[in-house]
From Swiss-Prot:
Cited function: Beta-xylosidase is an intracellular xylan-degrading enzyme.
Protein name as annotated: Beta-xylosidase
InterPro entries cross-referenced by the UniProt entry: GH39_as (IPR049165), GH39_cat (IPR049166), Glyco_hydro_39 (IPR000514), Glycoside_hydrolase_SF (IPR017853), Glycosyl_Hydrolase_39 (IPR051923)
Naturally occurring in which organism (per UniProt): Caldicellulosiruptor saccharolyticus
Entry's family note: Belongs to the glycosyl hydrolase 39 family.
EC code: 3.2.1.37
An annotated GO BP: xylan catabolic process
Gene: xynB
Ranges in a coiled coil: none
Length: 488
C-alpha cells in the first residue's frame, strides 16, 4: 500500500461531544484464583491499579479444588472453607479494587464427572445435585456479606460460569443445563440479598444473550446484567501460524459491530464484556509487540460512544497457568505485563488511554487513511490527541504523514508526543537484541523496563493565526501516537 497524500486532521477546540466513559478501565482479567495468592501477582496488580486505574478484576476458578472451598465430610455432608477467598478479597479491597466474581469451576465434591480444563484441571461438569450447587453459592454469599457488609458486596458482580457455549471445553453440559446452573446460582444469591448483582451467560463470541434473557423472563429467574466475551478469532490453542492466518481473515473493526448487536439483544439489561483481546491464544506473538497497542486503541475508539458497563481486557499479567507457566520473558502471553512485571506495548496503550480525561472534541479529516483512527479530548490544562495506525495481519499498511491543525486555541505553551512503535516502548525488540535470554537477571530486567517507557518528544508548531496552530506527525505502521498540547 502506498499513500502519497498527506492526511489532514483538524481539531475544533471548544466543540465538545460529551464526557468520556472509561469503560475499558472498569475491569481487567487474570488467570485463575490461586495465582492471586502470589506476591508477584499482587505487586503487578497494584501497579496496574495505580497507573491504569482498573477498578475490578475477574478471573476463573474461585471454586476450584486448589482454592479448598468445598469438601464432603465422612458423613456425606458438605463443608466449606472461604479462607483463601478472603485472602484475595482482603488484598483487592486494600489496594482499592473490587472482585468481579466468576462462579467457576465445579468442586470435585459436587461434580457429576471428571472432565477438566487447563493445566490446573478445573472441573467443567454439571453438579450431581443442583440443590447442593445452590447451597454452595448461598453459603459463599452469606459469608461475604457477613465479612464485608451488604453495602460493600452490593457493589460487586457475580457471574455464573465461563464460556458455557464452548461445549466440552468449558462446560460438559448442554445449554439447558447451563440455564439450570444459572437459575440455582441466581436464586441462591438473591435469597441472601435481593440487591446483590448476578448475571451471565459469560459466553464466547457474544452467544446465548437472547436465549438467557428469554429463559429468565419466562421462568422468573433474576438477572441484573448480561456478560459475554469477544475476540476477532476463536482459535484459542492453534499454532502461531494458524492464528496469524485466522486473525488476517478477521474484518477490521468487526468487534464494534458485534458490541452493537449485543447491546441490542441485551436491552434493557446492561452489558459487561468480561473478556476481550486481539486473539484468544495464550501463545500469540502479537500480544508482545506494538501491533497489540494499535489494536487496543483502535478498538476502544470504535466503541467509545457505546453504553458499555465494562470492557475487561484479558489479562493484566503473564503470570498465567492455563497451559502451564511459561518461563520465557516474551512468549505471546495475554498480559499487559510480562512475568517479570515489564510493561509491554499493550500496557503503554492503556496508559495512554488513561490520559483521556475530560470531554471529547470534534475532529475533521481530509484524505483520511483507512488504517488511521483517532480521538481528541480537552480539559482545563491540555488537549490530548491519540492516533492509532492499525490493520489486521498480512494486510496493507504504511507509514502515514499527518498534518494536524488545532483551531480555537488561545494559548499554546508546549506540544509533545509519546510513541508506541517498533522503536519506542517496545521491550521485546531489546530482548531479541540481547539474544533472547530465557531467564533474565536483575540488570536485564531493569534495561527492559527502561526500554518499555514512554518518552516525551517535543514537537515544533507553527501559528497560522491568533487562534490556530499546526504541526506535522509521522505515524508508523501498527503504532500509537499520543499528542499532548499544553494550553493552561
Amino acid at each position: 500500500m502506498e499513500r502519497r497524500k498527506i492526511m489532514k486532521i483538524t481539531i475544533n477546540y471548544g466543540k465538545r461531544l460529551g464526557k468520556i466513559n472509561k469503560f475499558w478501565a472498569k475491569c481487567v482479567g487474570s488467570c485463575h484464583a490461586t495465582t492471586a495468592l502470589r506476591e508477584d501477582w499482587r505487586k503487578q496488580l497494584k501497579k496496574c491499579r495505580d497507573e491504569l486505574g482498573f477498578e475490578y478484576i475477574r478471573f476463573h476458578g474461585w471454586l476450584n479444588d486448589d482454592m479448598s472451598v468445598c469438601f464432603r465430610n465422612d458423613d456425606g455432608l458438605l463443608s466449606f472453607s472461604f479462607f483463601n477467598i478472603d485472602s484475595i478479597i482482603d488484598f483487592l479491597l486494600e489496594i482499592g479494587m473490587k472482585p468481579f466474581i466468576e462462579l467457576s469451576f465445579m468442586p470435585e465434591a459436587l461434580a457429576s464427572g471428571t472432565k477438566t480444563v487447563f493445566h490446573y484441571k478445573g472441573n467443567i461438569t454439571p453438579p450431581k445435585s443442583y440443590e447442593e450447587w445452590g447451597q454452595l453459592i448461598e453459603e459463599l454469599a452469606r459469608h461475604l456479606i457477613s465479612r464485608y457488609g451488604k453495602n460493600e458486596v452490593r457493589e460487586w458482580f457475580f457471574e455464573v460460569w465461563n464460556e458455557p457455549n464452548l461445549k466440552d471445553f468449558f462446560w460438559a453440559g448442554t445449554m439447558e443445563e447451563y440455564f439450570k446452573l444459572y437459575k440455582y446460582a441466581a436464586f441462591a444469591i438473591k435469597k441472601v440479598d435481593s440487591e446483590l448483582r448476578v448475571g451471565g451467560p459469560a459466553t464466547a463470541i457474544d452467544a446465548w444473550i437472547p436465549e438467557l434473557k428469554d429463559f429468565c423472563t419466562k421462568n422468573g429467574v433474576p438477572i441484573d446484567f448480561i456478560s459475554t466475551h469477544q475476540y476477532p478469532t476463536d482459535l484459542a490453542f492453534s499454532t502461531s501460524s494458524n492464528m496469524e492466518e485466522a486473525m488476517a481473515k478477521a474484518k477490521r473493526g468487526e468487534l464494534a459491530e458485534r458490541v452493537k448487536k449485543a447491546l441490542e439483544e441485551a436491552y434493557p439489561l446492561p452489558v459487561y464484556y468480561t473478556e476481550w483481546n486481539n486473539s484468544p491464544s495464550p501463545r500469540d506473538p502479537y500480544h508482545d509487540i506494538p501491533y497489540d497497542a494499535a489494536f487496543i486503541v483502535k478498538t476502544i475508539i470504535d466503541i467509545i460512544d457505546l453504553p458499555l458497563g465494562c470492557y475487561s481486557y484479558w489479562t493484566f499479567t503473564d503470570i498465567f497457568e492455563e497451559c502451564g507457566q511459561s518461563s520465557l520473558p516474551f512468549h505471546g502471553g495475554f498480559g499487559l505485563l510480562n512475568i517479570h512485571g515489564i510493561p509491554k506495548p499493550s500496557y503503554r496503550a492503556f496508559q495512554i488511554l488513561d490520559k483521556l480525561n475530560g470531554e471529547r472534541i470534534e475532529i475533521e479529516f481530509e484524505d483520511k487513511s483507512p488504517t488511521i483512527d483517532c480521538i481528541a479530548v480537552q480539559n482545563e490544562r491540555e488537549i490530548i490527541l491519540v492516533i492509532s495506525n492499525h490493520n489486521v495481519p498480512l494486510s496493507p499498511i504504511d507509514t502515514e504523514n499527518i498534518k494536524v491543525v488545532l483551531k480555537g486555541i488561545e494559548n499554546c505553551r508546549e506540544v509533545f508526543v509519546e510513541r508506541i512503535d517498533e522503536y519506542n516502548a517496545n521491550p521485546k525488540r531489546v530482548w531479541l537484541e540481547m539474544g533472547s535470554p530465557a531467564y533474565l537477571n536483575r540488570e536485564q530486567i531493569e534495561e527492559l523496563i527502561k526500554a518499555s517507557e514512554l518518552k516525551k518528544e517535543k514537537v515544533s508548531w507553527g501559528i497560522v493565526n491568533n487562534n490556530e496552530i499546526t504541526f506535522d506527525l509521522s505515524v508508523l505502521p501498527h503504532s500509537v501516537v499520543a499528542v499532548t498540547i499544553k494550553n493552561g
